[in-house]
């Protein structure tokens, strides 16, 4: 899909949307959602060569974790990662993520942590981090997970304060025996997981 706008045009569109919502709601912190599709064409699985990309944009007030969630952490459940093999592609084909997220909702949990072939991948809409012996560990970049916007930020913060940071394959057993578990995402920021499948995390 060709980029339908220049960098300056994207920025201007975002500023216009954010300003409009701020005027209506007074919300200072907002989430901008941008969806680009290939465009309008007769229904076919083949990609139309001459379609003009369609752009949809919206903004919503940012809803960060509550004070209680920050203080006490959240509960998660786990599941087998049954999604397709290209989870690194950010697309609107999110049925696997939707089903995983619904599993956590059905159990009164904040997220569903996913495992494939015995190793941690990610959660339904978050990256997952393991704290072990003072080091922050995350799964390596691969086709099995989508790299979130907090990944590089966490690396930088670890470097600043001298915490070891390592991306490597993480067996499920290491997740369940972790000293701490964390979620990160654009809207969750960095959030502690204090229970996994009903069991307390860490000490």
Please provide the spans of the model-predicted regions.
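Conserved alpha/beta cores of soluble small-molecule-handling proteins
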Residues: 1-111, 117-119, 142, 151, ...
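Glycine- and Gly-Pro-enriched alpha-helical subdomains that act as flexible
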Residues: 115-141, 145-147
